[in-house]
Each structure stands twice: as C-alpha cells, then as structure tokens.
C-alpha cells in the first residue's frame, strides 16, 4: 500500500516588542530568572492585564502580508490548565475570534511552487518555563518568558512531505523577519514549530489520526521529526494497530519521537471569554497606518528584480530571502549597473565565502560598494573572470584595500596589449599542431584546449573571448 503524509503546522512567532503583551515588564532574553516577572505574570491578587497596542499592530502587518482577513473585533479567551510555570492557572489566548484568518503563503520546493492556506493567526501570551539543571534534583520556575507576546500561526493540513513543511516554515520565518515583527532566533525560542502529522492510504479523502510533535526549534529537527513520525505511524497501521491521538516530543539525539501525553481537545481547556479584557476594536486609522508602514514584500521585490535587473526568478528568490540580502543586492547592482553579474557573485562566491567563515552578510568584509567595484572591473575588461576570483580572495583578506589597490598590488590587470596576446596565440598554435588539425577537422573541443594553453601562457591575464576570436581568425 502507498501511504500519504498529511501535515499541518502551528508556529509560535514571538513578537519583538520591548514589553510583554499584558504588562510593562521587559521581554529581553537572557536575564536572571524571574528578573522580568511582574505582578501580572506572577498572578498576584487584584492585578489586571493591560493590552499592548504594538502587539495588535504587528499582527495586522502579518495579516496584510498573508493577504488575509483581519478581524476588526478581537476577543480574548482564557485557556484553562494547570502547570507550574503558569501561576494564573490559565493562558490568555484567542479561540473564536482570531485577529487573522484565511491567509495564504507561497512555498517553493525544488521547481514546484505551491500555495498553502493559513487557517488563522491569533494573539496569545507565552508561559514561563521549568528549570531542572543545577538545582540538585529540584525544579525551579522562571517566569521571564511568561507574558511574552506570541502570534500562533496555524496552517491548513495541506503539506504532504517533510520537505514541504520545512519550506513552509522557512517561508514564514523569512516573512516575519522581513516584516520586522520577530527576530527569528530559533535558538532563543522566538520561532517554535509544532507539527501535526498523520498518514492515510494514497487517494483516501478522510484524514488519519494525527499526532502533534511539540516545540521543534530548528528546520533540521522539523524535517527529522516528521519523517520519523510518519514512518512510525505507517508501521503501526501496517501491523494492524491504530494510531492514538497524542502529543509527542522529539529527541534530537536519538532522532525519534516519543509520547509525552495523550492529546487533549479544545473542550478539555474549558475556554471562556476573559472578563478582565475588553474586546479590542481595530479602527480604520489603525488599518491605514499599518498599510502605510508595510515594506515592499519579498514576492513583489523579486518580481521587480527580474524586471529591473534582468536576474532569473531563481536568483531573485535567493536575493529576497531577507531584507538585508535584498538591500545589499540593490545597492551593489545600482552602483555597478550590472544586475545579473552582481546576483551571480552574491549567490556564488560571496555566499560560499560567508558560509565557510560562518559569517552573516552584515559582517562581510566585502561590502556592497566593494562588490560593485569588483563587478565593474569585470564589465570594463580590467579583470577576467579568473582574475576576478583572485581579486575577490584578496578583497576578503584585505578589507581596507580598494579594488584598484588590490589589482595593482597583486598584478591582476587583464592584458590589453593586443599585439602581446597575438604573439602568444601564434606561439601556442605553432607548438600545438595536433590540436590545430583537430579543430580544423571540426572538433570544437580542440579550441578550448588551445585557449587554455594561451591562458596558461598569459598566467590568466589574457581575455578568453579575445583569445578565442584571434584563434578562430587565424585558423579560418
């Protein structure tokens, strides 16, 4: 039997506000335990929550970017459950009236483009965390994270593989960082993924029983967890047993999922409207303000890069993976007047160098103006492609040097003396009679061998195109 995997993702996006969703306490990461726990998070008697306006504004921006319906009336609900890191005994969330509904997000997997529907995105507060390390067998409670504003973004169960799930998570991660509503730091818990996974026979319309894998904080873990869980469910079904609905944990060391608890449903949490919070009504002025503050979105910018700079759609997608990358490209392409070559250098040599050094683009020793200068020297014939790679390496190692200084210091300027190049061509032709005869007999590969010999003789400084033209003219 052929099985189909069905996946829906619930992604917790931590909003990058300075204060918490219902109090003025700081959201800064890394403080001493409970340093940022206010009386609201500690649930002291008589305290009341006060809504953070910025949370609503950031949620609206995500809704606009997802081309979603934005509900003007927002009601908060209490999600009731007991856990030590939740002193109130309930989490403030949204059940029936989420701020964002019916959005969509485009993903790319290989050569395929697919649109995934986004069911909803709702505002809620984060819980605290239990601390087990360094307490001699005891468990401590850290409420610094409690009350941190979240948007829980829920997809439709339209993802059909781990690769699609990772592509969706990466697309949403790129979007929320692009909008500057989340810092996207997965190691610090700013972007956490829960994956709902089920399997069914290929062609069956009815969904199988799903199991939810909680708190996946890397794209690699997301892929591994889904693949393992799908195989585990298939094995259960092929053995004649039934999959039990459950909440799962992923063990990255063993690369496997395990049951944390049997899955609860919404009725188990006994949701009801929070009586301490009035409905939040989004005004026309707030909507207009959010629309005015929206940046050019990645898809729109990618289309513009194709139209204005002549780059391929594939390159445009890479260049718009982040706002920093897009800004770098546009600055360099405008300065050099060479869109496609700039894209090639960014997605090729520069990306490889950054990856090897473990650096972000912002820390690159080759800034956008320096890359533009390099590309410009290739365009005006000063550097051949081979010499340009040597110049790039020197620029990386010598961040204070200009391209002109590097070319002079390392003797990288392409030969412009036609007579000298012609003399080298004549000498190579005289010494490679066999290759000459092969070319005259119609063997085009022989031409490449002759060009290679001339380039070797010139120490890479001759212009390959010029050399090829001279050879063809002499052997015509």
Swiss-Prot record:
User: Which GO biological process entries does UniProt record here?
Assistant: glutaminyl-tRNAGln biosynthesis via transamidation; translation
Q: What SUPFAM superfamilies does the record point to? A: GatB/YqeY motif (SSF89095), Glutamine synthetase/guanido kinase (SSF55931)
**NCBIfam families in UniProt:** gatB, PRK05477.1-2, PRK05477.1-4, PRK05477.1-5
- Gene that this polypeptide is encoded by: gatB
Family assignment? Belongs to the GatB/GatE family. GatB subfamily.
Keyword annotations: ATP-binding, Ligase, Nucleotide-binding, Protein biosynthesis
Query: Any idea what job this protein has?
Result: Allows the formation of correctly charged Asn-tRNA(Asn) or Gln-tRNA(Gln) through the transamidation of misacylated Asp-tRNA(Asn) or Glu-tRNA(Gln) in organisms which lack either or both of asparaginyl-tRNA or glutaminyl-tRNA synthetases. The reaction takes place in the presence of glutamine and ATP through an activated phospho-Asp-tRNA(Asn) or phospho-Glu-tRNA(Gln).
Q: Which HAMAP family match?
A: GatB
Q: What GO MF terms are annotated?
A: asparaginyl-tRNA synthase (glutamine-hydrolyzing) activity; ATP binding; glutaminyl-tRNA synthase (glutamine-hydrolyzing) activity
Q: What is this protein called?
A: Aspartyl/glutamyl-tRNA(Asn/Gln) amidotransferase subunit B
Q: What is its EC number?
A: 6.3.5.-
InterPro entries attached to this UniProt entry: Asn/Gln-tRNA_amidoTrfase_suB/E, Asn/Gln-tRNA_Trfase_suB/E_cat, Asn/Gln_amidotransferase, Asn/Gln_tRNA_amidoTrase-B-like, GatB, GatB_C_1, GatB_Yqey_C_2, Gln-tRNA_amidoTrfase_suB_CS
**Family annotation (SMART domains):** GatB_Yqey (SM00845)
EC supergroup of this enzyme: ligase
What's the superkingdom here? Bacteria
